[in-house]
Design a protein with these regions (language model features):
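N-terminal Rossmann-like NAD(P)+-binding domain of SDR-like oxidoreductases, especially those catalyzing
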Residues: 1-140, 144
Length: 145
C-alpha cells in the first residue's frame, strides 16, 4: 500500500495510537503522519536510548502523551480530549522472559490495560475503527525458565 492510498483514508482523521514510543508504534505513527492523519500517541517513555521515536523526530510532528494504559482515568481524559476516530492499540509488555520475572505487571498491562483501552473505545462515540495489535512473541510455548 502506498502513502497516497493511505491518504485516501487517513488524511485529516484523528488517530490515537497506544504504544507509540515502541518500535512498531513509532513506525506506525510515522506512516500515519505521512498519510495526513492527526496522530496522538499514548505510551510510557521511550524504552531505549536513543529510541526510534526520538530518532525519527516524531515528537515534533504528533501529539505525544506519556502515560500508562493501566491508568484508566488519565487514558479516559486523553480519549475525551482527542476524540479519536481510529484507535490502534499496540501498548503492551511484550517480552516473554520479562513476563516470567514479573507476571503481575505483565497481566496488569496486557490484560487490564487492554480492558481500559476497550472501555475508552466503548465510551468514545467518535471511534469508528479499532485495531488491537499483539507481539510476535508468544507465552504459549514452553521455554526454560
Amino acid at each position: 500500500m502506498t502513502i497516497r492510498e493511505l491518504e485516501g483514508f487517513y488524511k485529516g482523521k484523528r488517530v490515537l495510537v497506544t504504544g507509540h514510543t515502541g518500535f512498531k508504534g513509532a513506525w506506525l505513527c510515522r506512516m500515519l503522519g505521512l498519510a495526513g492523519a492527526q496522530v496522538t500517541g499514548y505510551a510510557l517513555s521511550p524504552p531505549t536510548d536513543p529510541s526510534l521515536f526520538e530518532i525519527a523526530g516524531l515528537e515534533d510532528c504528533m501529539d505525544s502523551v506519556i502515560g500508562d494504559i493501566r491508568d484508566l482515568k488519565h487514558l479516559r481524559e486523553v480519549f475525551d480530549r482527542v476524540r479519536p476516530e481510529v484507535v490502534f492499540h499496540l501498548a503492551a509488555q511484550p517480552i516473554v522472559r520479562d513476563s516470567y520475572k514479573d507476571p503481575v505487571y505483565t497481566y496488569e498491562t496486557n490484560v487490564m490495560g487492554t480492558v481500559n483501552v476497550l472501555e475508552c473505545v466503548r465510551l468514545t462515540k467518535s471511534v469508528r475503527s479499532f485495531l488491537n495489535v499483539r507481539s510476535e512473541e508468544h507465552t504459549s510455548e514452553l521455554q526454560s525458565l
